[in-house]
From Swiss-Prot:
InterPro entries: aa-tRNA-synth_I_CS, aa-tRNA-synth_Ia, Anticodon_Ile_BEm, Ile-tRNA-ligase, Ile-tRNA-ligase_type1, Ile-tRNA_ligase, M/V/L/I-tRNA-synth_anticd-bd, Rossmann-like_a/b/a_fold. L-isoleucyl-5'-AMP binds at E554. Belongs to the class-I aminoacyl-tRNA synthetase family. IleS type 1 subfamily. ATP binds at K598. This is Isoleucine--tRNA ligase. GO terms for biological process: isoleucyl-tRNA aminoacylation. The gene is ileS. It comes from Streptococcus pneumoniae serotype 4 (strain ATCC BAA-334 / TIGR4).
Amino acid sequence: MKLKDTLNLGKTEFPMRAGLPTKEPVWQKEWEDAKLYQRRQELNQGKPHFTLHDGPPYANGNIHVGHAMNKISKDIIVRSKSMSGFYAPFIPGWDTHGLPIEQVLSKQGVKRKEMDLVEYLKLCREYALSQVDKQREDFKRLGVSGDWENPYVTLTPDYEAAQIRVFGEMANKGYIYRGAKPVYWSWSSESALAEAEIEYHDLVSTSLYYANKVKDGKGVLDTDTYIVVWTTTPFTITASRGLTVGADIDYVLVQPAGEARKFVVAAELLTSLSEKFGWADVQVLETYRGQELNHIVTEHPWDTAVEELVILGDHVTTDSGTGIVHTAPGFGEDDYNVGIANNLEVAVTVDERGIMMKNAGPEFEGQFYEKVVPTVIEKLGNLLLAQEEISHSYPFDWRTKKPIIWRAVPQWFASVSKFRQEILDEIEKVKFHSEWGKVRLYNMIRDRGDWVISRQRAWGVPLPIFYAEDGTAIMVAETIEHVAQLFEEYGSSIWWERDAKDLLPEGFTHPGSPNGEFKKETDIMDVWFDSGSSWNGVVVNRPELTYPADLYLEGSDQYRGWFNSSLITSVANHGVAPYKQILSQGFALDGKGEKMSKSLGNTIAPSDVEKQFGAEILRLWVTSVDSSNDVRISMDILSQVSETYRKIRNTLRFLIANTSDFNPAQDTVAYDELRSVDKYMTIRFNQLVKTIRDAYADFEFLTIYKALVNFINVDLSAFYLDFAKDVVYIEGAKSLERRQMQTVFYDILVKITKLLTPILPHTAEEIWSYLEFETEDFVQLSELPEVQTFANQEEILDTWAAFMDFRGQAQKALEEARNAKVIGKSLEAHLTVYPNEVVKTLLEAVNSNVAQLLIVSELTIAEGPAPEAALSFEDVAFTVERATGEVCDRCRRIDPTTAERSYQAVICDHCASIVEENFAEAVAEGFEEK
C-alpha cells in the first residue's frame, strides 16, 4: 500500500467535461419517455394555480435567439413555480395566419389568384403546420418543458371558434363598426395594417413649399394674397381640400421686395422662410391670429373645380414648415378629423397598389404615387416657392419593409373609444415589472385611435359578417354563434366553401333581404385579433389554466402588439385585463450592441450555440443578463458564460466526489454538533436559498446568477473548499470532523442541484443521477429547498463576517511574505498574530483551528505589542516566518513532529495517529515507496 492510498481522495465518475451538445438530446428523450411533464402536473394537482400564458411566435422558419431567450425565460419561471408548490402547466402556442406565409408560397411559385381559394388556404395551412413542427423541435431542444403534444395553434377549429366568439361579444356590445377612415395602408401588401404592423425607418422625401391663392378673403385678406403651405407628401395635393392653421398661432401678411404678390406665413418662421425662399427686404403688412383666418377660401393650386377652405386644427405647430398645412382628409388621421368636422370632401386619389387613380387628374393617372413629384412641380408652376430633400422617420410595413401611406378605405373597426376608460382602469390593476412598461401601455391606449380589424387578404380568420340585399351589415348574436359552431366543427375554410345562405342559421330572415338573398364578408381579421383572442381560445377554454392569466412575458415590442390587442379584446368581453402581471424583455443585440440582421451577418442561431456549447449555456446566458433591457450575445460572450458553467460544474463535481462515501441516513451530523465554521457555511447557504427563492418568485434571473456565482466563487471555492481538503482528504474517513464537513457538502450539493434545476435542468439531472440516496427519480419532480431558521444565526454570521475581515488581513501579510521570498506557498508559513482584545475575543468565538482556516502550517497568538516589522492594522498585526519542522508527506504541512516512522512513512504525529488507527495492516507491513 502506498501512503497516498491513506488519503480520502474524492472519487466519482461524474465527468469534468460536460459534453452537452451530445448528451442533452439523450436526456431530453429520457424525460419525454418518462412523461416527466405529465408527472409533474399530476404531482401538483390541487395546489394553487399559476398560469404563464405563452405569447404565440409566428410559425415561419427556425427560431432565432430572441425566441430562445423568451422561451427559456418562461421555462425557468414555470419550472421554478412547479418546484415551489404551484400547479403550473405550460401550453406553448403558435400564431399561424397572415401575410408572411402567403409571401412564402408566392416565392415558391404558388399563384393565389390563379387557383381555387380553398386549395390555396389548404397549402397555407400545410405550410404553417410544418413550421409549427419545425419550431416545436427547436424549442424542445432548448430543454423547454411543456405540453408539446397539445399546443394551441391559431388555425385550429376550436381556436378559430373561440376567436369568433370574442368578436361576437364585441359586436353585441356595439364595438364593431364599418367606416371609411384613413388607415395605415400598405400598397406592397395591398392591405390595411394595424399599428402593431408598422415599424419606423428613415426615409428621404421631397418636401415642397407652395402657395394657394386666396379666392374669398372674407374681408380679412385680399385676393392678391397667397397662403404658403408645406408638404412632405406631394402626391396628396391631388386630394387636398383645405388648409389648416393653428387658432392661437400668430401669422403675418408680408410682401418681399420686387414681388407683386403678398404671402401669409407663421410669424415665428418668417426669418427662416425668407432665407429659404430668397426673399429680401420683407415688409410685414399685417399680423393675424390663426382664428381670424378661419373659413377663408383659396383656390386649389391647379384644379379649378376645387376650392380649399382654411380651417383650424390643434395638430398644427411651428416646429417646421410654414405653420400652415394642406389638408387631404383621405390621406391622414388629423386631416380626416378636421376635414369631417368642417364638411370637407374625403377624396382618395391612390388605389390599393399605390397607383394614382382617374380622379387625381389625367396628368397623374396611372403613375406610382412616389413618382409624381416632377408632375406636381410642373403643375405648381410659379406657385412653387422652394423644394428640398429631407430625411425623416417614416412608417413602413413591418413585413415587406416598404413605406406605407394613410388612405381612407371602407374598413371594419373595433371602437376603442367606446370603452377606453375601462381599459385604462384595468391597466392600473396590473402589476408591471417595469414601471416604464405601464406608462408605455397606458399612453398607447390613451392616445390610440380605433382599431382597424379588417384585412384584404386570404389566409386568416374570416370576419363573420353578412350583408342583406339592401346592403345592411348583419352581425347579430344568432348568426355569429352559428358561424362559431360551424368553425368549431369544420374549421374556418367552411366560410369559403359554402354560400352565404348555407352559413346562416336555418330559417334565418332579415327585413333587408325580402328575397332571402345574402352575401358574406370577404375580408379577414387582423392577425393581432387572432393572437389577441388567445386568452379565450386557450386560457379560458383549457381547464388546466386560470383566467386572467398570472403572467404575460414577451418582448417590449408587444406593448403595441400582443399586450395591447389582448387587453382590448379581454376588457371588451369581460371588463378585465387578461393578465395579472406583465414582464417584458428587451432585444438580443450582437456583441457590439448592434441590431442583429442576416444582411449584416451578425445573427446567432440557437442551433449553432447548441452544437458548439449546448443549450445549457444559452439557458445560463439568459440568467446572466438583465433581459428587461436590450442584451448582448456573441460567441465570445457565450464562451465566458461557458467558463462560468465550467466553474459551477467542477465545484459541484468536487462535492459529489467528496461525498461518495457519505450515507446521509447514517452519517449526517446534527446541526448542533457541527463546528462553528460548518454552521456558518450552512447559514450562508441558507441565505443563498432565500435569495434564490425570492428571486425566482420575482422573476429576477440576474439576481440568481450573481448570487449563485458569488457563493460558488467566494464562499465555497475561495474559502470553505479551499481549506476543506485538509479535512476531507486528511482526517480519518469516518472521523467526526470529516463527517461534519461532509454533512454540509451533501446538504449544499442536494439543495443547490434543486435550485439550479429550473435554469440548468440537464446538468441538474446528471448530478441527480449520482445521488443514490435521493428518492425522486428525477430532480425535476422534487421541490425547491425551504428556507430554514437556525439558532443564533445572526450572531454566527456577525462573528464570521468579522473573521473574514481578519482573514483578508492575514492574507495580505502572507502575500507580503511571499513577495519577500520568506515563503512560497502559505503552508510554509508560521503566522504570528498580535491581536487586540476585540480580535482575541473573535478568535475565541470562531472556536476553530485557525491555522487550518488560513491554510498555514503554524499559527501563534502572541501576547504583548507587535514588533516594528509587523504588518499592522487597526485591531491586529502580523509577522510571517518560515514554519519550523519538515514537510509531512501525507498532509503537506510543515510540522516539527514530522519524522520517519517505522513503517516507512515521513509524516507528522497527527497523520501518524490517523494512519495507525485506520491502516493497521499497512503499518504492520510498511508502506511502499512513493
